[in-house]
Swiss-Prot record:
One of its GO terms (cellular component) is cytoplasm. It holds the Pfam family EPSP_synthase. InterPro entries: Enolpyruvate_Tfrase_dom, Enolpyruvate_Tfrase_sf, EPSP_synthase, EPSP_synthase_CS, RNA3'P_cycl/enolpyr_Trfase_a/b. The keyword Amino-acid biosynthesis applies. Keywords: Amino-acid biosynthesis, Aromatic amino acid biosynthesis, Cytoplasm, Transferase. Catalyzes the transfer of the enolpyruvyl moiety of phosphoenolpyruvate (PEP) to the 5-hydroxyl of shikimate-3-phosphate (S3P) to produce enolpyruvyl shikimate-3-phosphate and inorganic phosphate. The active site is at residue 320. It is found in: Cytoplasm. This is 3-phosphoshikimate 1-carboxyvinyltransferase.
Amino acid sequence: MDYLDLGPYSSASGTVRLPGSKSISNRVLLLAALAEGDTTITNLLDSDDTRVMLDALGKLGVKLARDGDTCVVTGTRGAFTAKTADLFLGNAGTAVRPLTAALAINGGDYRVHGVPRMHERPIGDLVDGLRQIGAQIDYEQNEGFPPLRIKPGTISVDAPIRVRGDVSSQFLTALLMTLPLVKAKDGRTVVEIDGELISKPYIDITIRLMERFGVTVERDGWQRFVAPAGVRYRSPGRIMVEGDASSASYFLAAGALGGGPLRVEGVGRASIQGDVGFANALMQMGANVSMGDDWIEVRGIGHDHGKLDPIDMDFNLIPDAAMTIAVAALFASGTSTLRNIASWRVKETDRIAAMATELRKVGAIVEEGADYLVVTPPQRLTPNAAIDTYDDHRMAMCFSLVSLGGVPVRINDPKCVGKTFPDYFDRFAALAKA
């Protein structure tokens, strides 16, 4: 097995320019593909998840011209030209869920599949929502999970569509992005949420990007969403992908644990991503944080004793960035509790179980529940722990931070960061110092 040995490091400082946001990149690619006109996308993330989206769009007949981190997408005016396609989408939820919805109304015969873990990640609530408007979608293996077979359906919207909100916000994102292309009786489509909607900031990203392409969604709280029906997306001409706020979390934490000053560029006060809220969680733990419109800087911890304060917080809004807090909790002066993180269980791996297992390897006492994690840091970190990453990019990036505790750490299968941040370890090593 490939591995990477990091540290021991005693400090981290410098400036890092973030790669483009995964969440924004894949949404913008699909919106541009469905729009009228050409869209020039800049700062597009180059990673496994964006590559599978680009490959799929190419197979569906979308004209794409790539040059570095710029991509010109020629829109299809709401309908893909290819009426049959076999689409392998890796482990990219941001590709599988929205594309499934777009294909369901495209009147073609499609197969959607991915890596084995993708076939364990739920999609049943989205399929149920699409079947309510007449979509023909069959499960090839297990009910509620990919691979999927999508066939032409008689699509009509004559009642509100109901979808669960407590498993993944990507189901709602997929419906919101697709439904404006469908004709409806009274010229509008309504989506109603059953239960609590998780990861609300990601829905905010979807709505704001749809608006850039000329379609406005109105929401009544977080339970009811109304969009115009039978309309076309219009290209904004140019759109820049802001830096990835989830990826920023590792460097911001490094600036706290390694003394800083460490500045990330590409996200800040003006960001549309909820994960910039990670900076607030770090501040609650005692880190010195300052922020501009498109930068955030951390200068160590504001205590003489050099330890973070423990935190007890609901992370429903920022589940991805919360993983970084779980590792930062190793450097706290007491026990931290991460609450409302049930969605971790259906991500790239079961992140609650994986995080608990690997935190114990470095000496922490960990209690895991259905939707929470309690982390008590050790007196001193266990050196030379071999961290398993479960083919999960965020596990690998999170546990790089252990090396800032003055102990070496081994990261198994470091290439899994290719999902969102292929050169992460090079960037991290450039900022960390012995």
